[in-house]
């Protein structure tokens, strides 16, 4: 079970991921955080830096690069990255082990060459993050095969969602229960009744929060916003647009954005349903839109690579044989769906199936 707690600075710590990162610190492998945009990879890196400093690592021995910051906009390719890291440590690094942490590394052209050189030259222990599945597998596998570990980072599970929403809830419940146990004497029921009332109230609150979870999803950033549909859905839709246009349309040079947009809406509207490329192409044809099955397949692969969706393959039960192009599509974060097409209670079956799929995935 996930271990989520609050640190002294008030941040919610997702201990499962931090522990996975720490297990490989000072080992000769690249630590790769893989997850969709805004899932919390940057916060995990900052928390890891905090733990390194707590263990006595000088701040000068830690280089943190976030490619979403204009501060590092000049780092365009692998040579820029390598020279920047080399000069940083030559100019002021302290004695001892060095650490290089790079966020959204896919924004640096041929970055894998710099990472391979960091390893070869012993420049520092490397932790990277990225939000594109293809970049973080094929390119890494080519240059540093056997010298990296992938740590997938998922949106919040429901348990994590509760912790973000009510950081002290579990602590308060434990305190109430302990107080009831200590003050209850034989024949006295006031404390027990109080505990029962607390439990009933908590169950009611949990039901309400699960409804919020189904509607808003598990991206950590929503917990900095008012719990209002209009506000949260605008935020989620802005994230979705960034992913679609920056990570998919621009990167893959998609020419017909209108067909691509329709495909995204179709996939989001059919979460949990068995989907085939031919079925989608036939639907488009019924709407007087001409496109090919191959185009649909390519677009779905691009969307999957951006980590917006997961495909659950269907198998022939008798022969354990995978049936081609007959998958169920699930969303990495269900809230993004509602930012795009709105929330409908009539879709509850697919939404619940999506939540269960992601919970099982997060548990490994």
What is each stretch, according to the model?
Residues 8-25:
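Pre-Walker A adenine-sensing motif
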Residues 131-133, 138-274, 307:
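Interdomain motor-coupling "hinge/lid" segment immediately C-terminal to the ATP-binding subdomain
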Residues 33:
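Hydrophobic anchor at the beta1->P-loop junction of P-loop NTPases
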Residues 54-69:
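Conserved catalytic segments around the Walker B and adjacent sensor/switch elements
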Residues 61, 228-364:
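Accessory nucleic acid-recognition modules appended to NTPase machines
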Residues 44:
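Hydrophobic positions on the alpha1 helix immediately C-terminal to the Walker A/P-loop
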Residues 41:
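Conserved lysine of the Walker
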Residues 65-96:
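Short glycine-rich substrate-engagement loop in P-loop NTPases that contacts/grips substrate
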């Amino acid at each position: 079970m996930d271990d989520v707690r609050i640190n002294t600075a008030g941040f919610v710590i997702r201990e499962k991921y931090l522990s996975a990162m720490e297990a490989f610190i000072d080992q000769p492998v690249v630590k790769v955080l893989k997850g969709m945009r805004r899932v919390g990879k940057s916060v995990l890196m900052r928390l890891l830096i905090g733990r390194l400093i707590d263990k006595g690592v000088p701040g000068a021995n830690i280089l943190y690069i976030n490619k979403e910051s204009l501060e590092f906009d000049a780092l365009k390719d692998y040579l820029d990255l390598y020279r920047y890291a080399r000069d940083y440590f030559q100019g002021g690094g302290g004695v001892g082990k060095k650490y290089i942490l790079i966020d959204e590394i896919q924004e640096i052209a041929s970055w894998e060459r710099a990472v391979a050189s960091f390893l070869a030259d012993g420049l520092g222990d490397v932790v990277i993050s990225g939000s594109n599945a293809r970049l973080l597998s094929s390119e890494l596998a080519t240059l540093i095969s056997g010298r990296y570990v992938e740590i997938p980072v998922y949106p919040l599970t429901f348990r994590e969602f509760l912790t973000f929403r009510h950081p002290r809830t579990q602590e308060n419940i434990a305190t109430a229960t302990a107080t009831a146990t200590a003050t209850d004497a034989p024949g006295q029921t006031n404390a027990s009744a109080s505990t029962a009332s607390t439990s009933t109230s908590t169950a009611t609150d949990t039901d309400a929060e699960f409804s919020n979870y189904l509607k808003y999803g598990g991206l950590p950033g929503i917990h900095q916003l008012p719990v209002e549909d209009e506000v949260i859905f605008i935020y989620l839709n802005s994230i979705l647009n960034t992913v679609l246009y920056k990570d998919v349309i621009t990167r893959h040079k998609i020419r017909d954005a209108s067909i691509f947009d329709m495909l995204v809406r179709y996939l989001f509207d059919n979460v949990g349903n068995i989907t085939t490329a031919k079925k989608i192409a036939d639907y488009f044809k019924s709407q007087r839109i001409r496109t090919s099955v191959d185009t649909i397949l390519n677009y779905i692969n691009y969307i999957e690579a951006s980590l917006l969706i997961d495909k659950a393959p269907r198998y022939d039960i008798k022969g354990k044989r995978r049936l081609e192009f007959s998958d169920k599509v699930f969303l990495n974060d269900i809230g993004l769906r509602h930012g795009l097409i709105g929330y409908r209670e009539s879709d509850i079956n697919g939404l619940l199936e999506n939540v269960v799929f992601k919970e099982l995935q997060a548990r490994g």
